[in-house]
């Protein structure tokens, strides 16, 4: 985790509600919408990310559908750079490219506009939660296919026991996680 004000990080972590047995039995769901409902915690989340990434030369912020939009877009505004949404198939109106990724039972895919990332754009990927890393791996592949440089990813929540951190560092990404929930 990044070195930050522990009081602020505690506010953020405490604002995330844990819902047992959702969406199915045995799962502890980390509900980031409760953080969004707490204006102080939401602002603190964006402020910490801005403080960490300001001056690092990013030209685009990419957020993954759908909760990555809620953190990526305000971060992009504060950094003065464009925001690019990565969406599920059929949701973007212009020409797109697609990348499939594996789920626990089956597969899914993500799309990005072909003109959203320019060659040599320096890109930061943002999402609410890092679990297995499959969504972000697919997102990184899309960005790199368009010629963008992506070496950084930021998350509000990380679930390190699910293997996503190792998967993404193997792709050469430097990860920032505001809070972790281990062993759950």
From Swiss-Prot:
Substrates-to-products reaction catalysed: AMP + diphosphate = 5-phospho-alpha-D-ribose 1-diphosphate + adenine
EC number: 2.4.2.7
UniProt keyword list: Cytoplasm, Glycosyltransferase, Purine salvage, Transferase
Location(s), subcellular: Cytoplasm
Sample GO molecular function, one term: adenine phosphoribosyltransferase activity
GO CC terms in record: cytoplasm
Keyword field contains Transferase: yes
InterPro entries the UniProt entry points to: Ade_phspho_trans, PRibTrfase_dom, PRTase-like, UPRTase/APRTase
Classification via NCBIfam families: apt, PRK02304.1-1, PRK02304.1-3, PRK02304.1-5
Family as reported in the entry's similarity comment: Belongs to the purine/pyrimidine phosphoribosyltransferase family.
Subunit structure: Homodimer.
Protein purpose: Catalyzes a salvage reaction resulting in the formation of AMP, that is energically less costly than de novo synthesis.
Protein name: Adenine phosphoribosyltransferase
């Amino acid at each position: 985790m990044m070195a930050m004000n522990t009081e602020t990080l505690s506010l953020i972590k405490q604002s995330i509600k844990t819902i047992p047995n959702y969406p199915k039995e045995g799962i502890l769901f980390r509900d980031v919408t409760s953080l969004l409902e707490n204006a102080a915690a939401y602002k603190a989340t964006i402020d910490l990310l801005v403080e960490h990434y300001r001056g690092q030369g990013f030209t685009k912020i990419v957020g993954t559908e759908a909760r990555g939009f809620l953190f990526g877009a305000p971060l992009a505004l504060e950094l003065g750079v464009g925001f690019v949404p990565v969406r599920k198939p059929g949701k973007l109106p212009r020409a797109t490219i697609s990348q499939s990724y594996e789920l626990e039972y089956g597969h899914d895919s993500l799309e990005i506009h072909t003109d959203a990332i320019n060659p040599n754009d320096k890109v930061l990927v943002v999402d609410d939660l890092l679990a297995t890393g499959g969504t972000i791996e697919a997102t990184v592949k899309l960005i790199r296919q368009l010629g963008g440089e992506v070496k950084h990813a930021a998350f509000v929540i990380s679930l390190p026991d699910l293997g996503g951190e190792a998967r993404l560092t193997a792709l050469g990404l430097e990860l920032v996680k505001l809070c972790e929930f281990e062993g759950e």
